[in-house]
């Protein structure tokens, strides 16, 4: 059987009542050609509009356990708020979580009980992907502009192939621009193989501006831009065993921009903020740090992260770092060296301790 549908309305009041939550205002329109063939339901030449948002494409829903949804959809403009329930918003106090500083790893071991010593940061809970059992997907998407998406700026030219089948999620040929002012592309796989959950990440970002320690009123274009490459893989039956099996490489190159020293204090725990002030002593007296460039290279092999090279250059200092973070033992051993740059009015004698080491348990 076949059916052609064309419907429209002046506003979204009826849809808001059905969903029992606010939706963006505007006209409503839908048209498409519906076909029912055996156990499959087709929507061909679909065009839907809700307010300024629109979707078009072809869909095929195949009945079964689980049901299967195939097709391709595109949009010239999509407001992601349509898919968010504003009546279910969580509230936070806005206060940062502070961690009690530890002076020395050996001294810390003396202060904790044997039970506390057995506690580990990475949970040893099984990874379950039952949510993937709800539906099989085989979709190609192309969105020209998406707004209100997870706190990002308007995302442009979002493209991806998404396949979900048998507890395996594959996102391939992902491309997007406007992600924190930059571009993102790559592939991602999360799959269950027998008793193990496998993850494969191959992503590249260009000119991403995260602004995690922004100065109040700071504009996006003055955040330090970051080019990042991440290639990781691993498999495990718990979050802990998966982390300890990770292999790969992360490389980031950072450009010029400003960060707020006071905001860093809110983002970091006490011990890491003290470390930040130790390797950047000017943060104690100056409100901002002007970063000029930075290079960060981390290699992972079976859960052991080797910080191969970290070089950070501000307008007044050069900071070097190297070390290891072992997810098997959950211990960290990282050293830092701070050098004053020539011709900026800072001498080595002005640095209380140019060498800083962070070691101990995570």
Where are these predicted regions, by residue range?
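Small-residue helix/turn framework positions
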Residues: 1-54, 64-92, 131-152, 157-362
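Intrinsically disordered, low-complexity segments enriched in small/polar residues
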Residues: 86-130
């Amino acid at each position: 059987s076949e059916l052609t549908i064309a419907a429209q309305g002046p506003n979204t009041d009826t849809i808001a009542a059905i969903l029992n939550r606010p939706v963006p205002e505007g006209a409503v329109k839908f048209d498409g050609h519906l076909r029912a063939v055996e156990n499959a339901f087709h929507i061909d030449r679909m065009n839907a509009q809700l307010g300024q948002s629109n979707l078009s494409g072809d869909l095929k829903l195949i009945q079964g356990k689980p049901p299967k949804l195939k097709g391709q959809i595109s949009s010239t403009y999509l407001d992601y708020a349509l898919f968010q329930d504003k009546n279910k918003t969580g509230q936070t106090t806005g206060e940062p979580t502070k961690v009690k500083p530890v002076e020395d790893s050996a001294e810390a071991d003396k202060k904790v009980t044997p039970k506390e010593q057995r506690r580990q940061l990475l949970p040893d809970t099984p990874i379950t992907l039952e949510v993937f059992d709800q539906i099989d997907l085989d979709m190609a998407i192309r969105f020209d502009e998406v707004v209100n998406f997870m706190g990002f700026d308007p995302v442009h030219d979002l493209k991806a192939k998404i396949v979900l089948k048998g507890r395996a999620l594959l996102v391939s040929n992902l491309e997007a621009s406007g992600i924190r002012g930059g571009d993102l592309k790559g592939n991602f796989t999360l799959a269950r193989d027998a008793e193990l959950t496998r993850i494969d990440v191959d992503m590249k970002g260009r000119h991403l501006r995260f602004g995690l320690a922004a100065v109040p009123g700071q504009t996006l274009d003055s955040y330090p831009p970051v080019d990042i490459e991440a290639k990781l893989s691993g498999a495990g039956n718990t979050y802990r065993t998966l982390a300890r099996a990770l292999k790969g490489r992360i490389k980031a190159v950072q450009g010029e921009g400003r960060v707020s020293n006071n905001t860093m204090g809110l983002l970091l725990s006490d011990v890491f903020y003290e470390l930040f002030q130790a390797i950047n002593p000017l943060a104690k007296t100056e409100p901002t740090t002007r970063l000029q460039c930075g290079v960060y290279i981390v290699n992972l092999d079976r859960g052991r992260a080797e910080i191969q090279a970290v070089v950070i250059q501000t307008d007044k200092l050069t900071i070097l770092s190297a070390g290891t973070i072992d997810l098997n033992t959950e211990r960290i051993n990282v050293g830092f060296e701070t050098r004053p740059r020539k011709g900026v009015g800072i001498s080595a004698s002005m640095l209380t301790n140019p060498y800083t080491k962070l070691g101990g348990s995570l």
